[in-house]
Amino acid sequence: MAKKPEKEAPAPEGEEGAEGEAPAKKKPPILIIAIAAGVLVLGGGGAAAFFLLKPKPAAEAGEHGEKKEEKKKEKKKEEKGDKKDAEKGAEGAAGTPVIKEGPDGVVFYTLPDIVVNMQTADGKSTFLKLKLTFELPDEETADELTPNLPRLQDMFQTFLRELRPEDLNGSQGTYQLRVELLRRVNLVAAPAKVNAVLIEEMLIN
């Protein structure tokens, strides 16, 4: 009799387990890659946020602060300068002569108002206010007068204080006042010469 073919021996359980587990072993590498990519993304975002939100170095902050302080100081200086210029302009308007061109080449030189306390017989205070304008032949004479203005004002003040109110009464008194003022101003202006003294305003109070 012929022998029955022998049955194939069943494959060991270990081998089947090995074949069944083979596909499962491929999953861990994919998971690791995904986790690594996520870590990189999060790490990159964190680094960007760190650099963006990172406080400026102390040196840069100090320079920025110094620039602000310098701008503030410059602004204050400009404001002070503007204020001083305005004050000087106001002083100039009140204490310097006004020079204007007149007809036929003459120049009008108006002095700041002169106020003096005059003598009176009864001892009462009487004030004289004068607004005087000189008629000059040219601008060069005005240039000669301006530096000597303090001397001229002192000379006028001394002379006017010696006057009494009755000395200025009538046209004769006004004429005599012009003559005396013209003589004195030409003493200061020499060798230049003032043509005339014009009394624009005269008040006695």
UniProtKB/Swiss-Prot annotation:
User: Taxonomic classification, please?
Assistant: Bacteria, Pseudomonadati, Pseudomonadota, Alphaproteobacteria, Caulobacterales
Its keywords, alphabetically, are:
Cell inner membrane, Cell membrane, Chemotaxis, Flagellar rotation, Membrane, Transmembrane, Transmembrane helix
Q: Cross-referenced Pfam families, in alphabetical order?
A: FliL (PF03748)
Q: Where in the cell is it found?
A: Cell inner membrane
Concerning what turns on (or off) its expression, the entry says: Found in all cell types and all developmental stages (at protein level), the transcript is turned off in swarmer cells and turned on in stalked cells.
Q: Does the keyword Transmembrane helix apply?
A: yes
- Transmembrane ranges? 30-50
Specify the protein name.
Flagellar FliL protein
Q: Which cellular component appears as one GO term in the record? A: bacterial-type flagellum basal body
Protein topology in the membrane:
Single-pass membrane protein
**Region Disordered, annotated ranges:** 1-25, 58-98
State the residue spans of region: Not required for flagellum motility, although mutants lcaking this region swim less smoothly and are more sensitive to O(2) deprivation: 26-63
Function, in words: Controls the rotational direction of flagella during chemotaxis.
**Which species expresses this protein natively?**
Caulobacter vibrioides (strain NA1000 / CB15N) (Caulobacter crescentus)
Changes seen on gene knockout: Forms a complete but paralyzed flagellum.
One GO term under biological process is:
bacterial-type flagellum-dependent swarming motility
Compositional bias of kind Basic and acidic residues: 1-10, 61-90
**Family, per the entry?**
Belongs to the FliL family.
